[in-house]
């Protein structure tokens, strides 16, 4: 029995990642879920948040937004509109985005505007936590 | 008859033009390669996306989703026209615009209102001269666009469709067949035909999946994205076609320059010879007169 599974992350612009991993944790739309080898076929929508995978004793973090996960045959495919490895995340930009989103949220007039601001804020926060988690795990260089 | 100096000036100016067209040809070919790369990079995503959608559509009884629903009365038609921002690419933009305007005229003849969403300066400029309304024009975006552009166009038309402001949406783009051929293509993106969504349903021998949330919930997430994927594909194709068309146009221009230089050089030599002959005649005539 295989004990590893292949993780593939693709976005419209590029293939972000394709490698063998031990464990994948993904932010499902109805809560986080974990995938290990020999999982049964599974299809889920992803929310905005951090995906992480373990390889050996190292944990890597990736920010994803607007995606889907398909699991089957010891292969996890993530289709995301945006996917950034922790190392690629621009902290300064995320912080700026966070402040901007907060300001927009504060003076949002209608429901749509405030929902948009909230989504932007959520993305900025997720990026920051992603970088943070990766720094703690010491895997920002990967 | 043109003087010697005139012809020489003309030759010099044509040679300079040729330098420019040649440079543009090379730039276009480099950009074409880049654009083709992007299509290649997009392919894994698109393939996987269709596969997933196929699996889902096979699992679900053609479940009713507002984007699949055909509106009862079709009053307003939206056309998303993709063109380039810059000219000098032969008849490429004209072809796109003509295809879009033909579609618009067709719909108008059926008594429907037509609204335009224009990507690229050229299309927006051409449509602005017609009677049709431009809801949104994206200018200067074709040179460096990413999925966000497709997403924002997608969201615009989806919102309008759900609000029943639009009842049909078409995408006009330059299909990149190969370097020599980029015919305009018109694709209906809304309402989605369930065949398009379930196109690959039969090939996908779908295994028993666990779906989270439900099949319907997943479809609700996937279908709007399908619109964006189609728009993105259209944009990528158009940008590829634009560069290919410019390459061909500039190649033609360079060749035309060569032809003209050749003709002019011939003329130059003839004129020069004529001038020399005339001079000689003068000298000989003068010498004869002195002898006499």
From Swiss-Prot, chain A:
> What's a single GO CC term here?
plasma membrane
- In Pfam terms, one family for this protein is ATP-synt_DE_N
Report the superkingdom from the record.
Bacteria
The terms under GO molecular function for this entry are: ATP binding; proton-transporting ATP synthase activity, rotational mechanism
* UniProt-annotated location(s): Cell inner membrane
Membrane-spanning ranges: none
Keywords tagged on the record:
ATP synthesis, Cell inner membrane, Cell membrane, CF(1), Hydrogen ion transport, Ion transport, Membrane, Transport
This protein's membrane topology, according to the annotation, is: Peripheral membrane protein
Q: Does the keyword Cell inner membrane apply?
A: yes
The stretch of residues making up the signal peptide is none
Q: How does it assemble?
A: F-type ATPases have 2 components, CF(1) - the catalytic core - and CF(0) - the membrane proton channel. CF(1) has five subunits: alpha(3), beta(3), gamma(1), delta(1), epsilon(1). CF(0) has three main subunits: a, b and c.
Q: Which HAMAP family match?
A: ATP_synth_epsil_bac
User: So what does this one do?
Assistant: Produces ATP from ADP in the presence of a proton gradient across the membrane.
Family assignment? Answer: Belongs to the ATPase epsilon chain family.
Q: What is this protein called?
A: ATP synthase epsilon chain
Q: What is the scientific name of the source organism? A: Maridesulfovibrio salexigens (strain ATCC 14822 / DSM 2638 / NCIMB 8403 / VKM B-1763)
Name of the coding gene: atpC
């Amino acid at each position: 029995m295989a004990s590893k599974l292949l993780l593939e992350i693709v976005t419209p612009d590029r293939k972000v990642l394709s490698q063998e991993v031990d464990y994948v944790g993904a932010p499902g739309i109805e809560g986080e879920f974990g995938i290990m080898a020999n999982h049964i076929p599974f299809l889920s929508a992803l929310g905005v948040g951090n995906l992480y995978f373990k390889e050996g004793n190292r944990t890597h973090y990736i920010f994803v937004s607007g995606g889907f996960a398909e699991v089957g045959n010891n292969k996890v495919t993530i289709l995301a509109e945006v996917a950034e490895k922790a190392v690629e995340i621009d902290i300064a930009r995320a912080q700026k985005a966070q402040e901007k989103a907060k300001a927009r949220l504060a003076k949002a007039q209608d429901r749509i505007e405030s929902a948009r601001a909230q989504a932007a804020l959520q993305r900025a926060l997720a990026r920051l936590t992603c970088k943070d988690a990766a720094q703690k795990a010491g895997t920002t260089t990967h | 008859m043109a003087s010697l100096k005139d012809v020489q000036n003309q030759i010099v100016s044509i040679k300079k033009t040729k330098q420019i067209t040649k440079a543009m040809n090379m730039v276009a070919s480099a950009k074409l390669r880049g654009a083709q790369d992007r299509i290649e990079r997009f392919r894994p995503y698109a393939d996987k996306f269709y596969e997933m959608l196929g699996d889902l559509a096979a699992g679900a009884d053609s479940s009713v989703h507002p984007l699949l629903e055909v509106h009862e009365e079709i009053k307003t038609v939206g056309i998303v026209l993709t063109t380039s921002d810059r000219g000098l690419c032969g008849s490429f933009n004209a072809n796109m615009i003509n295809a879009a305007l033909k579609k618009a005229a067709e719909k108008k003849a059926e008594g429907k209102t037509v609204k335009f969403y224009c990507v690229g300066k050229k299309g927006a400029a051409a449509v602005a001269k017609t009677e049709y309304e431009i809801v949104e024009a994206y200018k200067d975006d074709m040179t460096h666009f990413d999925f966000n552009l497709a997403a924002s166009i997608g969201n615009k038309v989806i919102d309008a469709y759900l609000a029943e402001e639009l009842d049909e949406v078409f995408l006009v783009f330059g299909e990149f067949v190969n370097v020599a051929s980029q015919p305009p293509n018109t694709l209906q993106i809304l309402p989605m035909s369930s065949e398009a969504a379930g196109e690959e349903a039969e090939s996908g021998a779908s295994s028993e999946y666990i779906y989270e949330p439900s099949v319907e919930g997943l479809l609700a997430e996937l279908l709007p994205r399908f619109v964006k994927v189609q728009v993105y594909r259209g944009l990528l194709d158009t940008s590829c076609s634009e560069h290919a068309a410019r390459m061909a146009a500039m190649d033609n221009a360079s060749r035309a320059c060569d032809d003209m230089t050749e003709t002019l050089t011939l003329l130059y030599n003839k004129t020069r010879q004529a001038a020399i002959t005339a001079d000689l005649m003068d000298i000989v005539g003068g010498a004869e007169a002195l002898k006499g």
